[in-house]
Amino acid sequence: MNKTEKKFLENMHRQKLVANGDAVLLAVSGGPDSMALLHLFASVASVLHCRLGVAHCNFMLRGDASDADESFVRDACAELGIDFHVRRFDTASVSSAWKKSIEETARLLRYDFFGELCREASYTRIATGHHSDDNAETVLFNLFRGAGISGLRGIRVRHGAIIRPLLPFTRREIVAYLEEKRVVWRDDHTNEGIEYDRNFIRNRVIPVIEERFAHKLMPSLQRISEHAGELEEFIDLHISRLLEAHPGLDLAGGKLHVGTMRQLSMFERKEILKRALKLQGLSVGSNVLNRIAGLLDNQAGRSVPAGAGVEVVLHDGFLRFRQTGNPSDHR
């Protein structure tokens, strides 16, 4: 076991990402990150006492190259004795039908497939190959989109059944590991373009910033991500205590006592509103959230549509969430 494999195993134990008897589904595209994920897991699976399987998505976006990726990953799994699952998607057609970007469509298709495999083949964890450079790029991408604290946190090491055990590793470390182990990988040349937003950030924006501020950008973005994560955990704890201390803030019942809400800071009000909306299955933008928060300073009877047939209305001293029967999206 070399130093990279030891670091990987130590991180798995420290973060408690896998338990004895877990079945881990590895998302493997054939690129360097996912091939490192595959070989690192294969090297420590016996120590972790976990079963491995691989899921490969053929998005049929690159013609013969997509099929070659599929064959490559299939052969790698056969060589390692790991179960291989593949699904082909007509991503371009689905993207058009869903009226979503290719990136978003591929993401949704990918995770639907992973969830289906977990149910059918009893996988308990899904591991992806995101690393620290991906996290830094995500923070920058979210910053450009005007994200709040949650967005600046970047990629979480764990989200439900999904784990990202390569987050402590840089892209450079991953490539060095593959070269040391003489593991080959597939290059997706579409990653070198700038058509997609993330590629534009990776290939144009970051190099320009690093040229001016050498070796400072990635560590700085990583620190921002860590600080945002710590702050988000503090906020979650603080809001949970607020809700426990004030029975009038009944998120589950869909009503919030106006008098109590008015005693809170605007930040606290919005955090509570976001949690109440989440329980309604809603995630609204900042404009709608500001309008809902503004109800606290209005007369009774005023309302704000929150989307998906839900409106927030000021009535009898409470903010109430009620169904309108109109599912139109006002977000």
From Swiss-Prot:
Record function comment: Ligates lysine onto the cytidine present at position 34 of the AUA codon-specific tRNA(Ile) that contains the anticodon CAU, in an ATP-dependent manner. Cytidine is converted to lysidine, thus changing the amino acid specificity of the tRNA from methionine to isoleucine.
Where would you say this protein principally sits, based on its record?
cytoplasm
One Gene Ontology biological process:
tRNA modification
- Reactions accelerated catalytically: cytidine(34) in tRNA(Ile2) + L-lysine + ATP = lysidine(34) in tRNA(Ile2) + AMP + diphosphate + H(+)
Q: Which residues bind ATP?
A: S29, G30, G31, P32, D33, S34
Enzyme Commission no: 6.3.4.19
Tell me the compartments it is located in. Answer: Cytoplasm
Residues in a coiled coil are none
Q: Which family does it belong to?
A: Belongs to the tRNA(Ile)-lysidine synthase family.
Alphabetized GO MF terms: ATP binding; tRNA(Ile)-lysidine synthase activity
* EC category name: ligase
Q: What's written under domain?
A: The N-terminal region contains the highly conserved SGGXDS motif, predicted to be a P-loop motif involved in ATP binding.
Q: What is this protein called?
A: tRNA(Ile)-lysidine synthase
Q: Which InterPro entries match?
A: Rossmann-like_a/b/a_fold, TilS/TtcA_N, tRNA_Ile_lys_synt, tRNA_Ile_lys_synt_N
- Keywords associated with the record: ATP-binding, Cytoplasm, Ligase, Nucleotide-binding, tRNA processing
Q: Choose one Gene Ontology CC annotation of this protein and give it.
A: cytoplasm
